[in-house]
């Protein structure tokens, strides 16, 4: 699943490719991609609108249009590709935006889980899925004191708590594993058991890991490519995710893989020891 660094990289690429272009026509091959309004209304409303900008909130893309905001979530395998209108249409292409200059933005999704929604202009940040998100993982809005207070309220394991997007947004499976490894915290450690120094270390690790991943253009594990068709490079810097059986870069102990909250989870059994009772 594209996480914050991948979605931010897609946003930057799309900004270069389609901002300023006017939509001539929208073709929808898989109607379920369109959450609302009805497909024919979606197509009709977009025709003639100009893309004025592209924003991101968590893992959501917000296309700023002349008359609406269009919200897009890539979910598991969604991606955008930029084409000439006469280019061959690839398998798994579900939505095509044709511009007045003869170029196209195409949405492809092997799993068909991605969704698009039209909302009134400048109301993208009021969308229900976006309103539920925690702060972005940057020091100006992600505050250590608030993060610490939030963790104290939860006895659940730290990994699923970080994945639910309410304390801080943008973390998915890859970057939670990486941040917990950097902070030397076991993924099943109860959140309310973390000491202030551990919370501070984790807070900084979240900011650091995501910032470095954005700079690297994200992580390409399977199918992720940015809007320019380029792979991310952060996979070469992964310390724990996907490193099962390889020596820990900090202590040399083999990395292990387990399941936490039904998610494949990687950690170092030496550096990230569970303190106290294991949560179920």
From Swiss-Prot:
GO terms for molecular function: 8-oxo-7,8-dihydroguanine DNA N-glycosylase activity; class I DNA-(apurinic or apyrimidinic site) endonuclease activity; damaged DNA binding; zinc ion binding. Binds 1 zinc ion per subunit. The active site is at 2 (schiff-base intermediate with dna), 3 (proton donor), 59 (proton donor), 263 (proton donor). Its cofactor is Zn(2+). Pfam families: Fapy_DNA_glyco, H2TH, zf-FPG_IleRS. A zinc finger (FPG-type) spans 239-273. The keyword Cell inner membrane does not apply. SMART domains: Fapy_DNA_glyco, H2TH. It comes from the Bacteria. DNA binds at residues 92, 111. Its EC number is 3.2.2.23, 4.2.99.18. Keywords: DNA damage, DNA repair, DNA-binding, Glycosidase, Hydrolase, Lyase, Metal-binding, Multifunctional enzyme, Zinc, Zinc-finger. It catalyses: Hydrolysis of DNA containing ring-opened 7-methylguanine residues, releasing 2,6-diamino-4-hydroxy-5-(N-methyl)formamidopyrimidine; 2'-deoxyribonucleotide-(2'-deoxyribose 5'-phosphate)-2'-deoxyribonucleotide-DNA = a 3'-end 2'-deoxyribonucleotide-(2,3-dehydro-2,3-deoxyribose 5'-phosphate)-DNA + a 5'-end 5'-phospho-2'-deoxyribonucleoside-DNA + H(+). GO terms for biological process: base-excision repair. The keyword DNA damage applies. Involved in base excision repair of DNA damaged by oxidation or by mutagenic agents. Acts as a DNA glycosylase that recognizes and removes damaged bases. Has a preference for oxidized purines, such as 7,8-dihydro-8-oxoguanine (8-oxoG). Has AP (apurinic/apyrimidinic) lyase activity and introduces nicks in the DNA strand. Cleaves the DNA backbone by beta-delta elimination to generate a single-strand break at the site of the removed base with both 3'- and 5'-phosphates. Monomer. Belongs to the FPG family. HAMAP family: Fapy_DNA_glycosyl (MF_00103). This is Formamidopyrimidine-DNA glycosylase. It comes from Enterococcus faecalis (strain ATCC 700802 / V583).
